[in-house]
Amino acid sequence: MTHKSVRDYIRTIVDFPHEGILFRDVTTLFADPRGFRIAIDQLLAPYAGMRFDKVAGLEARGFILGGAVAHQLSTGFVPIRKKGKLPGRTISVSYQLEYGEAVVEVHDDAIQAGEKVLLVDDLLATGGTAEAGIKLIEQLGGQVVGCAFVVDLPDLGGRKRLEAMGMEVHALCAFEGL
């Protein structure tokens, strides 16, 4: 029997959402029970023996992964959402997009000072959203002790951006090219 790698479960869609883009679709990974289990196990592998107080996931596919990772670790899950999607009191950080600006938010009581947090998302591109998530966690007094992604797009420089912030970055696979 041939064993598939996580990368083998990810479908590439040409010209989505715009012409010239190769969209790395992880929903095919999520839909396969074996692939999804492999991904969760591999996301956690570098952190064996470490203790986390919370797992934070970036909207939207980071919620799927982060929830599964938090369950596996028996810890809480913190959603980092687009502006205006969380009820109650929040804090926010804005960050630059290719054409404009975006804002992400987290509940102001989601993370306590000193808590160790693992940040999880499906894909690392430029690192802008992840950097904003890290800043939110740090504003609340949390410590990001790892950043775990299924896919890294190294040509877009996200890993270097996060590593320049002192972050440990773990990705299950990389896709070169845009």
Swiss-Prot record:
<dbReference type="Pfam" id="PF00156">
    <property type="entry name" value="Pribosyltran"/>
</dbReference>
<keyword id="KW-0808">Transferase</keyword>
<dbReference type="GO" id="GO:0003999">
    <property type="term" value="F:adenine phosphoribosyltransferase activity"/>
</dbReference>
<dbReference type="GO" id="GO:0005737">
    <property type="term" value="C:cytoplasm"/>
</dbReference>
<dbReference type="GO" id="GO:0044209">
    <property type="term" value="P:AMP salvage"/>
</dbReference>
<dbReference type="InterPro" id="IPR005764">
    <property type="entry name" value="Ade_phspho_trans"/>
</dbReference>
<comment type="function">
    <text>Catalyzes a salvage reaction resulting in the formation of AMP, that is energically less costly than de novo synthesis.</text>
</comment>
<dbReference type="InterPro" id="IPR000836">
    <property type="entry name" value="PRibTrfase_dom"/>
</dbReference>
<comment type="subunit">
    <text>Homodimer.</text>
</comment>
<comment type="similarity">
    <text>Belongs to the purine/pyrimidine phosphoribosyltransferase family.</text>
</comment>
<dbReference type="GO" id="GO:0002055">
    <property type="term" value="F:adenine binding"/>
</dbReference>
<keyword id="KW-0660">Purine salvage</keyword>
<keyword id="KW-0963">Cytoplasm</keyword>
<dbReference type="GO" id="GO:0006166">
    <property type="term" value="P:purine ribonucleoside salvage"/>
</dbReference>
<protein>
    <recommendedName>
        <fullName>Adenine phosphoribosyltransferase</fullName>
        <ecNumber>2.4.2.7</ecNumber>
    </recommendedName>
</protein>
<comment type="pathway">
    <text>Purine metabolism; AMP biosynthesis via salvage pathway; AMP from adenine: step 1/1.</text>
</comment>
<dbReference type="InterPro" id="IPR029057">
    <property type="entry name" value="PRTase-like"/>
</dbReference>
<dbReference type="GO" id="GO:0006168">
    <property type="term" value="P:adenine salvage"/>
</dbReference>
<dbReference type="GO" id="GO:0016208">
    <property type="term" value="F:AMP binding"/>
</dbReference>
<dbReference type="InterPro" id="IPR050054">
    <property type="entry name" value="UPRTase/APRTase"/>
</dbReference>
<keyword id="KW-0328">Glycosyltransferase</keyword>
